[in-house]
Swiss-Prot record:
Family membership noted in the UniProt record: Belongs to the D-glutamate cyclase family.
Annotated Pfam families: D-Glu_cyclase
Keyword Thylakoid among record annotations: no
Name listed for the protein in its UniProt record: Putative hydro-lyase BLi00500/BL02808
Species assigned in the record: Bacillus licheniformis (strain ATCC 14580 / DSM 13 / JCM 2505 / CCUG 7422 / NBRC 12200 / NCIMB 9375 / NCTC 10341 / NRRL NRS-1264 / Gibson 46)
The keyword Lyase is annotated on this UniProt entry: yes
Keywords, comma-separated and alphabetical: Lyase
GO MF, one annotated term: lyase activity
Signal peptide from the UniProt entry: none
Length: 262
């Protein structure tokens, strides 16, 4: 069976066994995927406030109880220590390690935040005949740090990160309509067109993920991205912060359509 047709729990089981270690775009089609941020309880409120003030890049889907690795609302049989294909470990704002299991790092005062992911609306784009280039090219989605500032909260501040998908010019309006229905997974784009206008100097060199082909007659469309907390971590420099590796998400049990507003 192709991973696109698997149930979320089947995908998570393969990830837990180490049989899937790559990006999760297109897996368990129709189910919501989530970004991850893990912090010590003492920083959890500040980060929650940061997300509340920056709902476009950081729409919260679930928050674990302190010390619990179980996202009880979105995937009650999942374990956030093992069920992402790859994690990043930041120490004092520096990327210290990239691992496939964080069980050995888990402590009983940690809180996990699951943040909506734009992979969720890709099925809706494809259902509307809008191509998703990184899936076509079997690459990770390109992501860029911008000059768009987030609203600060305590020690958390920094620039917004965006993901980019090339869209045929005549379908750009439809892409806005389709994704605006799903505000819990970033919603409509934050920018269409000139990358330079939002501080991206070279679209062929993403800060995270992989470059993709932009064809003649296509326009780059940028959506707020849940990798934003990783850029913010580099500014806030918490003692320890664990995140997913960009593109390597948790596949939840929640269907995409449950987040639709129209």
């Amino acid at each position: 069976m192709h991973v696109n047709e698997m149930r979320p729990d089947e995908v998570r089981a393969l990830i837990r066994k180490g049989e899937i270690t790559g990006p999760t775009a297109g897996m368990a089609g129709g189910f919501t995927q989530a970004n991850l941020v893990i912090l010590k309880k003492e920083l959890a409120f500040e980060f929650l406030l940061f997300c509340q003030r920056n709902q476009k890049p950081c729409p919260i889907l679930d928050v674990t109880d302190p010390g619990s690795p179980v996202p009880s609302i979105t995937a009650p049989d999942a374990d956030i220590r093992t069920d992402f294909p790859k994690y990043r470990v930041y120490k004092r704002g520096e990327l210290a390690d990239e691992v496939t299991d964080i069980s050995s790092l888990w402590e009983d005062d940690m809180v996990g935040f699951l943040i909506g992911c734009s992979f969720t609306f890709e099925q809706a784009l494809m259902n509307n005949g809008i191509p998703v280039r990184h899936i076509e090219e079997k690459r990770n989605v390109p992501m860029y740090q911008t000059n768009i500032p987030c609203v600060p909260a305590g020690r958390f501040q920094g620039p917004m990160v965006v993901s980019m998908r090339p869209v045929p010019e005549e379908q750009a309006v439809r892409a806005v309509q389709v994704t605006s229905r799903l505000p819990a997974v970033h919603g409509g784009p934050v920018h269409i067109g000139s990358p330079e206008a939002i501080g991206i100097t070279d679209i062929a060199k993403p800060d995270f993920g992989d470059a993709v082909t932009i064809k003649k007659g296509e326009v780059p469309v940028f959506w707020a991205c849940g990798v934003t907390p990783q850029a913010v971590a580099m500014h806030a420099r918490p003692e320890l912060m664990i995140t997913h590796s960009p593109g390597h998400m948790l596949v939840t049990d929640v269907r995409d359509e449950q987040f639709g507003v129209l």
